[in-house]
A protein has these predicted regions:
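Short turn/helix-capping motifs enriched in Asx and small/polar residues
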Residues: 111-113, 535-552, 573-575, 581-583, ...
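Active-site scaffold of zinc-dependent metalloenzymes
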Residues: 691-731, 741-745
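Active-site or metal-binding loop neighborhoods of secreted/extracellular toxin and effector enzymes
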Residues: 749-831
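Catalytic Zn2+-binding segment of zinc metalloproteases
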Residues: 737-753
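Short alpha-helical catalytic segment bearing the HExxH-like zincin motif
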Residues: 580-583, 726-738
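Beta-turn initiation residues at beta-strand->coil junctions
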Residues: 2-8, 25, 31-37, 46, ...
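Aromatic-rich beta-strand edge motifs centered on tyrosine
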Residues: 15-28, 40-49, 65-74, 89-107, ...
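A motif-centric feature for acidic-aromatic and gly/ser/thr-rich catalytic loops and repeats
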Residues: 2-3, 8, 203, 293-300, ...
Length: 831
């Protein structure tokens, strides 16, 4: 199967633009090729589970990633091996199982034995379930993990993660209460220490306190405690923090309006307060504080009115000065930013154009073709600092030329045109950038997670990274000339050259040398605009270009590294990269350096495009693209951001969303038909944010809810019975609503047109026809709720029924009857 994006229409090159898929006789995906990348191979066992895979970079090294399952179908071991292609292909003839043996035997001495012969296996992940017998195994015994006192049947109890870039491992264990909530977690650290988290819950499952103890191999220890308070609606109202023997600090205090929207934030016992205002559509319109204020305009203000949620203009004031700064914005018909015109004063007519940022064009894949950027050129002068022309090989950047003759003054951002060659950038078989001659980068090496492990510069300087097998950054090492700086990330404790220097908090950080608190004051995108100390004094002021570059007028912006979107900025040796966790971002070019892991949900967009060309309205929150709202023990509505992974959450609604994601993803991979893809996309994609709330009336998606961010309303035991008798589980219903959310986020204009009532005589709307005939059929089939050739329905009718669980399509007759008595069940348009 071929998917040909818009770029193919102008340049019909399958290798550069096409998405290519091949399936076996069981309709399982066995071959996948992304644009500009080498193909990936997938191999399944007789139980239709993925047991081997291989991308282009792994093929160069003759490596095959492998997956071993237990008898319950849970992944117990992941790693890479050197099996021959012929041997790997025979895996489909058997069911690959991992058996837990006694003692330090098997794969990486984990105790697991695989029924498949693995040649030179290198283990990356080991998972233990149900019991704590692993405590005495190799590696765990050194950390004195305690025995569990409550049954953990069905739960992940322990894990081993390798550290990519070293020979070490991270050992961890989770302990549960009788309600299957994690009450204690222990994890070893890369510096030889240990982190322990102990959580106390309210009756409703909300955390009341979290006690964190951190130690390292030198004997240093730190203890901190968070205490949480909620109002009658279970909304978080107070967060207190204490570390070591220091006095407790009221870190955060929240107040809400009558609609449940955040109205006021206070920091550090009220030394700094921020007020928020909204319009009738719940879109944020202003942030007001003494050190930072911002007004956002949509249909009013100085720019061209935008009625679709785009911000037409914004004005802000930061720090101690009284200068009003701002931009008015212009967008094209695809909601991509084309021009940001800077000005000062209340109507932005003073000092105009000083910091403009203009995108001079996009290609059909939304790759930026050119950028004009103005900035400060001397102590008193301003002018054009970048006039970029960008050329591509498919979606991959080939070269950049800068026609501007001015350079930026001070500490601002601009593009450094280091060379003038036909090919200034190179990429590997997975689409990762391996060379940037303009930054004098000769080589970038990547690990098997497509995360950078080593950057080598022309002058001999080196930056290296250490990650665990989940992709969490553990260490950064900068070798700049004769100076070496090692930064260790031990949870929220930051070390530099072995010395603990910072303790990150929910509102900023503590400098450990003087025990002082520092707070981030943020704008609507989570950009850190101002840093204030515990007395409310301004320590840092940051002003940003729309795509994230720092303006030269920023003040003391080297105080701390967390800037745009709250992400860590590395400026050493001219790197100027933001670390978003899954990928690195270059704000001077408005591009990523690696392929979007969810690019297959955005065929019309380049996998390197940042925020779909709209950095004013969209953010990349570390992949935490699903924000799940729930009521905690105090009845307060709080949120939990989830980006995937095998996580157990104490709140039952949050856990049900996680279960739906895991179920849809696993069955979609097993079926190889694209089932569950919408659920996976909204959870894992780095460019979108979707809220999930517990339904009261019906399962649905509302694009105007949650300040215009959109919200899925869903209940974990509400399935859907069609008029032909077919029942879809709540998990399948969730994917239906996720597809609506995904279309709203990625194809807004068409979504708004197609969801008009009456636009389709059979399915009520064209949008419902698209979802019902597409993702609903795939997910229902993948989840075993419909057979091959069978359809869920041929209309938009459906009746809510109570099922026996998130993943069940078996109707609970008694509860359904009770529900129907209360609600007078009717055939509705949702789900």
């Amino acid at each position: 199967m071929f998917v040909l994006p818009p770029g193919y229409q102008d340049y019909p090159d399958l290798d550069l633009y096409a998405y290519i898929y091949r399936y076996d006789y069981l309709d399982r995906l066995v071959y996948k090729k992304l644009p500009g990348c080498a193909p990936s191979y997938l191999v399944y066992d007789a139980a239709h589970r993925l047991v081997f895979s291989q991308d282009g970079c792994q093929r160069n090294d003759s490596l095959w990633p492998f997956f071993v399952y237990d008898v319950y179908g849970r992944v117990v071991v992941e790693g890479e091996c050197s099996n021959s292609d012929k041997h790997v292909r025979t895996a489909g003839e058997t069911v690959v199982l991992g058996t837990l043996m006694e003692g330090d035997t098997g794969l990486a001495y984990s105790g697991y034995q695989s029924s498949s012969d693995l040649v030179d296996p290198c283990v990356y992940v080991v998972n233990y379930y149900d019991t704590y017998d692993f405590r005495t195994r190799n590696g765990f015994s050194a950390y004195n993990f305690p025995e569990g006192t409550v049954s953990a049947i069905g739960n992940l109890t322990g894990s081993i993660l390798c550290t990519h870039g070293s020979s070490g491992f991270i050992y961890s264990a989770d302990y549960y209460d009788i309600n299957k909530r994690i009450v204690k977690s222990l994890s070893s650290r890369v510096n030889g220490g240990m982190d322990t988290y102990a959580t106390e819950y309210s009756f409703q499952g909300s955390p009341l306190s979290v006690l964190h103890t951190h130690t390292d191999s030198s004997g240093y220890s730190l203890t901190e405690r968070y205490t949480y308070t909620y109002d009658h609606s279970s909304r978080l109202t107070r967060v207190s923090h204490q570390y070591d023997n220091n006095p407790s600090v009221l870190l955060l205090e929240h107040a809400y309006d009558e609609l449940g929207r955040l109205q006021t934030d206070k920091l550090d016992n009220g030394i700094y307060a921020t007020d928020y205002a909204y319009n009738i559509r719940n879109w944020l319109t202003s942030i007001e504080g003494s050190k930072f204020s911002q007004s956002l305009h949509y249909t009013d203000g100085l720019g061209v009115p935008c009625y679709n949620g785009n911000i037409s203009s914004m004005v802000w004031k930061s720090g101690e000065d009284d200068i009003m700064r701002g931009y008015h914005f212009t967008y094209d018909n695809l909601n991509r930013l084309t021009n940001a015109v800077y000005g000062e004063g209340s109507v932005l007519v003073q000092n105009q154009n000083r910091f403009n940022e203009q995108v001079t064009g996009y290609d059909k894949m939304s790759n930026i073709l050119g950028i004009k950027r103005s900035g400060q050129t001397s102590s008193t002068g301003y002018g054009l600092i970048d006039d970029l022309a960008m050329s591509y090989n498919g979606n991959q950047l080939k070269s950049v030329s800068d026609r501007a003759t001015n350079s930026v003054y001070g500490n601002g951002f601009d593009f450094k045109d280091g060379v003038n060659k036909e090919a200034e950038y190179e990429y590997d078989e997975n689409g990762n950038m391996t060379k940037d001659l303009n930054k004098k980068i000769l080589n970038i090496q990547y690990n098997c997670l497509n995360l950078p492990s080593r950057i080598e510069f022309e002058n001999g300087h080196v930056i290296s990274y250490l990650y665990d097998a989940d992709g969490i950054k553990l260490r950064t090492t900068h070798i700049i000339g004769s100076d070496t700086t090692v930064t260790d990330y031990c949870g929220n404790v930051i070390y530099e050259n072995g010395i603990p220097v910072k303790l990150l908090t929910e509102a900023g950080y503590v400098t450990l040398a003087d025990s002082k608190y520092h707070y981030f004051v943020q704008d609507h995108l989570g950009n850190n605009r101002v840093v204030v100390d515990q007395s409310g004094n301004v320590e840092e002021v940051n002003h940003y270009y729309p795509f994230g570059g720092l303006l030269s007028s920023s003040v003391s912006n080297a105080v701390q590294p967390y800037k745009y979107n709250g992400k860590e900025l590395d400026r050493k040796n001219g790197l100027d990269w933001y670390d978003y966790g899954a990928r690195m971002y270059d704000a001077a070019l408005g591009r990523w350096h690696a392929v979007d892991p969810m690019s297959e949900k955005y065929y019309s967009w380049s996998p390197y495009t940042y925020c779909m060309g709209n950095p004013i309205n969209h953010i990349d929150p570390d992949g935490n693209t699903v924000v799940i709202w729930y009521n905690n023990d105090a009845g307060k509505k709080v949120s939990y951001s989830y980006s995937g992974g095998d996580i157990t959450h104490p709140n039952s609604f949050v856990q049900s969303v996680i279960t739906a994601y895991q179920y849809n993803k696993a069955n979609g991979l097993k079926a190889g038909n694209g089932g569950g893809a919408s659920t996976v996309a909204i959870v894992e994609n780095t460019n979108i944010k979707v809220n999930v709330m517990e339904a009261v009336f019906e399962n649905s998606y509302n694009p105007n809810a949650a300040r215009g961010a959109g919200s899925i309303y869903w209940k974990s035991n509400w399935g859907s019975q069609k008029d032909n008798g077919i029942v879809n589980s709540p998990a399948t219903v969730f994917d239906h609503e996720a597809d609506h959310a995904l279309e709203h986020k990625t194809n807004t204009q068409e979504y708004e047109v197609n969801r008009a009532r009456g636009s389709d005589s059979q399915y009520q709307t064209k949008e419902e026809r698209r979802v019902i005939t597409g993702s609903e059929q795939k997910t229902s089939r993948a989840n075993g709720e419909t057979r091959s050739g069978q359809v869920t329905r041929r209309n938009h009718n459906g009746k809510t029924v109570i099922t026996k669980g998130v993943t069940s399509n078996v109707i609970d007759r008694q509860k359904t009857q009770e529900y129907e008595k209360r609600n007078k069940a009717v055939w509705t348009s949702e789900p």
